[in-house]
Amino acid sequence: MELAWHLVLIVLLSFSCWGLDWDSDKNFISAAGPLTNNLLHNLRDPLGNQDPPFVAEDEEIYVCRQPLPAFLPEYFRSVRASMITHYKVFLPWAQLLPEGISENPDKGTVLCYRQLLEALKTAQLQPLVVLHHQTLPASTLQRTEAFADLFAAYASFAFRSFGDLVEIWFTFSDLERVITKLPHQESRSSRLQILTDAHRKAYEIYQEKYAAQGGKLSVVLQAEMVSKLLLEPSTSVLVKDAVDFVSLDLSYECHNEADLPQKLSELQTIEPKVKVFIFSLKLQNCLSTGNDIAQLLFGLLKAINEDQVLVVGFDISTFLSCPSSSKKSWACSLSDSLTLQTALQLGPDTAAYAWPPCSAYQRVWEAFANQSKAERDAFLQDVFPEGFLWGVSTGAFNVEGGWAEDGRGPSIWDRVGHQNTIKGQATPEVASDSYHKVDTDVALLRGLQAQVYKFSISWSRIFPTGQGHNPNPRGVAYYNKLIDSLLDSHIEPMATLFHWDLPQALQDRGGWQSEDVVDAFLDYAAFCFSTFGDRVKLWVTFHEPWVMSYAGYGTGQHAPGISDPGVASFKKVAHMVLKAHAKAWHLYNSHHRPQQQGRVGIVLNSDWAEPLSPERPEDLRAAERFLHFMLGWFAHPIFVDGDYPAALRAQIQQMNKQCPSPVAQLPEFTEAEKQLLKGSADFLGLSHYTSRLVSTAQGDTCIPSYDTIGGFSQHIDPMWPQTASSWIRVVPWGIRRLLKFVSLEYTKGKVPIYLAGNGMPIGESEDLIDDSLRVDYFNQYINEVLKAIKEDSVAVQSYVARSFIDGFEGPSGYSQRFGLYHVNFNDSSRPRTARKSAYFFTSMIEKNGFLNKVVKRQSSPGIANIPRKIRAFTFPSEVPSKAKVVWEKFSNQPKFERDLFYHGTFRDDFLWGVSSSAYQIEGAWDADGKGPSIWDNFTHTPGSNVKDNATGDVACDSYNHLDADLNMLQALKVKAYRFSISWSRIFPTGRNTSVNTHGVDYYNKLINGLVENNISPMVTLFHWDLPQALQDIGGWENPSLIDLFNSYADFCFQTFGDRVKFWMTFNEPTYQAWLGYGSGEFPPNVNDPGWGPYRIGHTIIKAHARVYHTYDEKYRQEQKGVISLSLSSHWAEPQSLVPRDVEAADRMLQFSLGWFAHPIFRNGDYPDAMKWKVGNRSELQHLATSRLPSFTEEEKRYIAATADVFCLNTYSSRIVQHTTPRLNPPSYTSDQELLEWEDTSWPATAMNRAAAWGTRRLLNWIKEEYGDIPVYITENGVGLTDPELEDTDRIFYHKTYINEALKAYRLDGVNLRGYAAWSLMDNFEWLNGYTVKFGLYHVDFNDVNRSRTARASARYYTEVITNNGMPLSKEDEFLYGQFPKDFIWSAATAAYQIEGAWRADGKGLSIWDTFSHTPLKVENNDTGDVACDSYHKIAEDLVALQTLGVTHYRLSISWTRILPDGTNKYVNEAGLNYYVRLIDTLLAANIQPQVTIYHWDLPQALQDVGGWENETIVQRFKEYAEVLFQRLGDKVKFWITLNEPYVVANQGYGYGTAAPGISFRPGTAPYIVGHNLIKAHAEVWHLYNDVYRARQGGIISITISSDWAEPRDPSNQEDVEAARRYVQFMGGWFAHPIFKNGDYPEVMKTRIRDRSLAEGLNKSRLPEFTESEKRRINGTYDFFGFNHYTTVLAYNLNYASWISSFDADRGVASITDRSWPDSGSFWLKMTPFGFRRILNWLKEEYNNPPIYVTENGVSHRGEANLNDTSRIYYLRSYINEALKALQDKVDLRGYTVWTLMDNFEWATGFSDKFGLHFVNYTDPALPRIPRESAKVYASIIRCRGFPDPAAGPHACLQQEDAEPTASPASPVSQKIQFLGLRLSTTEAQTALNVLFAFMLLGVCGVAFLSYKYFKHSKQKHTQPGEHELSHRSSF
């Protein structure tokens, strides 16, 4: 019987060939069992004679008893290894429920059976559980009538007790036997009915209560009973209604071939069709030879096939037997059998019993080998299944960059990249910089419409050393942001744990050749599952491990560059990877799947292999072997049997036998490892690129190589098209064949296939945008995938294209571009530009295949809650209008208040959009029947004055690139797209008799594309491009155009109105009328400034009204849209608030906005201001009538209220002043009687200066003038001449303008509903041609494809849309809390800035004395000769300090006041005595002195000998310090050696803007000075530490200053590095040597050295410290004294190599954000957030030293400004950020404000005022007057921070509010303040009475006007949400 067993196993292997199946997720059932007592006896005695080990006849069935036999687990594993999938278990009803009731079970028996079932599950055997087989409980025999209920109760008990372990149940296995056991007083039919009822009840209970267990239930029937049971409805339930499948007890007569078909044919009568399981098969009259068994098996299969009975499995026990001599195992495994070929030869010869082909490869080959080329390449027009996933992929090391950012550790690819072995010496350091571009990449994915994004996690970014102990939080944050952003955009993340980039630290320990890496990978995987698994539901453990094994450890072409194919690759790496994968899968399966419900798989790569010579069997075998070596190496252990393919092992064994020494070693898996591996994937990810022709290896060689070991050689067909990669040829049909092979060999329809990588590269020399070859590649390959699904039934569930963007491609560097998006690696911002293939791929996703999508007309997203025909006012506007209140409210705002940034959000349904217009973007000027427009005619006419003679012939070519435009809109996340329709594209002649269907189709496609993506179309009917045919009959001067325009509009409403819900009739008619018919600059170039604009405007208003009524009457009810027109205006700000200028400003608005708005939104007529001015000037010009036409009363009624919303285009502001212009010649501009100009302080742009604050005022004016009408800003943007993608100025523009709109909405109640940025992309900007760029997207007009690339502003605008405004970030929220009790509060000054007395009492000259007395050095020629005269005002200064309540006072010592010549030869006692008195006074007032030894005022005598450039200064400084320690050290316990050495070195000796004013050695002097300053500090620190610390007990350190720097573009690696460099060169220059390692920062040393050498020098200009100096300098601090004021935006700036300066060495340029509040100092912007960030940077960079903020403050200019709100804002904000830093665990010990009082601010003299106290320099007494900020600072000190108002009033704040009470004896003044006048009480009483009378009249007037007002309108006021009004919104 040994051969028979082998044949059975072969048959089992062949079931997939026959198509026998259960369903899509369960294996075919091959059953054995149950356990019997005889079987257990034989298993206990393996040396004795034994029966077949899994055969069980009806001998006594084993009843479970504890403990279970110890050998059972091993036995079950051997059973499973023999391809048996299920095992029968018979439950003993009587033993489980001895009393017959489920309430009292035998718990021991229950536990025993659970253990038995668990043992089966552990062995991966599924239990087949029979509820009852033989013995009935006694209780059932006594109550036959209750049998059904008792059995149902027992069944319920069993389901409940074992259901979690059982999937298949049988109620009875032998009905006849049970019938005989029941009492015989009942008839047989009655007893059968009892059993039927019992079964039915059990089935119903399972379905009702236990269906969630997912199991199936049946009853075993004898085949002969089926037809009888079906005859009786009462028993037919046993066959079809109460079973999930039919289970048969079947006997087979071997000599009667018709026996089995006859029995099975009866099952065909059952409807609906049922599945059949052969529970037991009894053979009769059968021989036991292999030949007969083979005939029997295949006869059985033939019978099943012929009768089309769906057999889901059967009992194979009858066939199983091993020879009695077999002692080695309990089961005969397939590996022990004869070869398949031998078995086939032993089979029968008859055709009826032909052996099924069992080689998956052979079956695929035979299926496709004979295809004709036409048949093979036939294109399938069909779609993919619903739910098919489309995506793109990347790998971390390919795209992320940021190789050393934020704590990431190096990977093996970083190491290889730095070895200069990559093509072009490329490295992955920056790559595509995706680490900084999450928002950019996700936007592109949105535009692409990707449904899944496959990316990999950089192991070393999470665990820098690879070990899972300390995860890198910033790396984790990056992936959290990426995953969250993907999900927010409805993109499924598919995360790969390992994509070839092993942490270098692990490679140093052996890499994948070490078992340790498996454990490390498991820790890493566990962390990822735990951290990201709540959102990631698709996991890939390894990406293409074959590549890593083959190229990384075999050929050495990939990292880590090891060339050892025989041992490292085969023996170690692949083996470790497989074990790591399996362990990770089981980890997820056991610990994470229940909660996370995700799937874990692996991505394997494989080429398809065809035999080179199909007629040669050896080539056929070689091709199959190739697949086993490439794909089966990893797939076979995971998806088949837990072990390597037999072909792989046999080939290696054969090679090793042929060679004198082994060429390869294939390790063995233990049985446990095999069980771990088998089935350890929820899906098979497959990547495929190309195919190979394979032949058997020629010649004998023992040189180890992949091909040699495999015994094959690879070839290509020269006819296969080439790609940029030598290894990829285009062979589309290979992917279909590979998928079929994978399905047959590995997945068998049970495991889904995810196609996870397919694509081809283009080369650097090819067209980088037009990748038509790749489009063809995708088109063909995707179609072959579709064939595999539709025609071959392969379960492919996704297609993921490689690659999303260009990236680092390993050995080929950046020379091969796989991306759908081109990345410009020559640009530091790494911009991405969509290729043609991106748009093709999007079309595939949209259509889900290859059939043109049936367009279902969807309704556009509605415009929310627009009231109809709002008419707030029906009376004309006054002159000046009541809207003048806007100027009264806003024009006196201080600049700080005006510009302060406001945080909040817009209404939930706010409509965010972008704008464009037809002529500016469409191009295709004469394509597809379009007629010419006036702009076509104009631009084609010589002398048109369009810059560069540009035309709109092609423009952005949007007519031919609709897919690109939709891609951008989706990426932006806009909710609306405002575009215009080209009248001449719809009606070429302008008339409805000439409809152009091609043009209509274009707009239908555009509108459908928008609506499908939930983007509302906002359509402008006319945007200046009148059909030339209509211009030829007079254009807008011809009244017939009103009807023609209405006809055109009617057609558009009828054709597009079902989807367009927002219409605008005209765009900016003011410009249309003036520029086209006034100045004549625009076509039709009519120069008639006095009459033309008014005539045209008149026609336009009537045309608009006509169209409005057409829509209102014919379409509105059905289409439910809104209609208006877009009006434009700058804001008009009066030069002064004198009435004539205010009237002029109002008049400017009436002549621009009011010209069209007043008739439409008010009373149907022009504004009086316009009528009066034009009328009066016409009369003065002796004209009979006004040049402004008039409307009839009927026309007024027709025009009034013909707009549903107010659409506004605005860009800038103007300063306006009244003037009286000349009368002639008449002109629209002169009629306004005003002058207008832009303030030169406003930021310049290409066309208008930016004045964002005007937007808020203009919106308020509209509200006041036209009522509470919904307002949409339909154009707002900025033109720049710079085409760069880093358009920071545009970001600032939109940021500030949108913020002003937000203020108008939230603070002023303007009913603002939407905002559309101008413009989507660069376009034809009228007379400016293409020289001015307004686009959020750059368009390359030199590229025939007009490629579009997102600018930085696009990313910013998307961020605003995502946030629906500008909400306050969590980081910026105000923090309430207190500082520690011992926190130091201080105020600072400096000697030269306040003392004065410059020559008093023997003081010597300092360099600042000299500098300030040098012409043109200090603003206003100010000096510090007197300053605040603090030398004589100790008492006054003390009062100021006591007002603040500070605990400390930071002052500096004037070196020359102590040592007049700078040396210790003479000590000036008078000067020293001043400091003694000052310090004693402080101490007496309980104020501790913080003394700065040097604050920039070097003795001039020392400067005369070189100053800080002379190394002797180190000793002079030490001597000076020692004098101070000796004389003052007993009083002073807080010393600062130097203040801001950066300023001393760079500004004093580099720029020359500070004393001593040296600027001619900027590349050397600052570094020499800095060098000496550091050494001087160190020597003084050591002096104090060694000599004075012990007895004086003080602390000493240095004060270092630094701005914080943010990258200008955080997504640009160069900017990130520039910001880091800025801080290191400023703060790190001095901090690094002292606080870190005694030497300069590495970046300083490297850059200065490199630039010095580039200049031709032989060494660096930066001096070097000796090793002993480094040791002496390092650690010379007790605290970190830190001065900080502001933040900058930094970006890289490369200076010419010949420029030698600090700035050139640093290579950084800096700017500031326009939204940051100004101060009185040009260099100081208020940026509180930077304070917290730089404090945290100090903590991280210098190991959290104790930090004292020794200066922080803000300046103003101008008047005394006692109510210094800007300083209050600054102090509260900055100190609050310091409190947050404390919360961040920064060791912050104290805060010092700069400054106590106004003083001499160096080169700005007394102009910059930093003081909390105002010093009146015009008063000889120089009084110190506290500002409001002094009170606020005192309050903060008193409260130790910021008490939470939610906790109620705090005592510290109540002190602030207390007012002094006047003494009774105090005289009371008889004069009182009344309305700004000092009056007697009698005078005030009289005045009050008069005012009261006036007030009564006013109240009556207001009441009357209110009545009239509310009668005509309803006002709605939007109230700002309290939660959005931060402390910053108080203005």
From Swiss-Prot:
Its EC number is 3.2.1.108, 3.2.1.62. Residues 1649-1931 are annotated as: Required for homodimerization and transport to the plasma membrane. It comes from the Eukaryota. It holds the Pfam family Glyco_hydro_1. Residues 905-1368 are annotated as: Glycosyl hydrolase-1 3. Residues 44-286 are annotated as: Glycosyl hydrolase-1 1. The active site is at E1068 (proton donor), E1275 (nucleophile), E1540 (proton donor), E1751 (nucleophile). Residues 20-1886 are extracellular. N-glycosylated. It catalyses: lactose + H2O = beta-D-galactose + D-glucose; phlorizin + H2O = phloretin + beta-D-glucose; D-cellobiose + H2O = beta-D-glucose + D-glucose; quercetin 4'-O-beta-D-glucoside + H2O = quercetin + beta-D-glucose. It is a single-pass type I membrane protein. Its main location: membrane. It is found in: Apical cell membrane. GO terms for cellular component: apical plasma membrane. Residues 1-19 form the signal peptide. Residues 1375-1848 are annotated as: Glycosyl hydrolase-1 4. PROSITE patterns: GLYCOSYL_HYDROL_F1_1, GLYCOSYL_HYDROL_F1_2. Keywords: Cell membrane, Glycoprotein, Glycosidase, Hydrolase, Membrane, Multifunctional enzyme, Signal, Transmembrane, Transmembrane helix, Zymogen. The chain crosses the membrane at residues 1887-1907. One of its GO terms (biological process) is glycosylceramide catabolic process. It is an enzyme of class 3 (hydrolase). GO terms for molecular function: beta-glucosidase activity; galactosylceramidase activity; glucosylceramidase activity; lactase activity; phlorizin hydrolase activity. Homodimer. PANTHER family: GLYCOSYL HYDROLASE, LP05116P. Broad specificity glycosidase of the intestinal brush border membrane that hydrolyzes lactose, the main sugar in mammalian milk, to produce D-glucose and D-galactose. The mature protein is composed of two domains that catalyze the hydrolysis of beta-glucopyranosides and beta-galactopyranosides, with a preference for hydrophilic aglycones (in lactose and cellobiose) for one domain and hydrophobic aglycones (in phlorizin and glycosylceramides) for the other. This is Lactase/phlorizin hydrolase. It comes from Ovis aries.
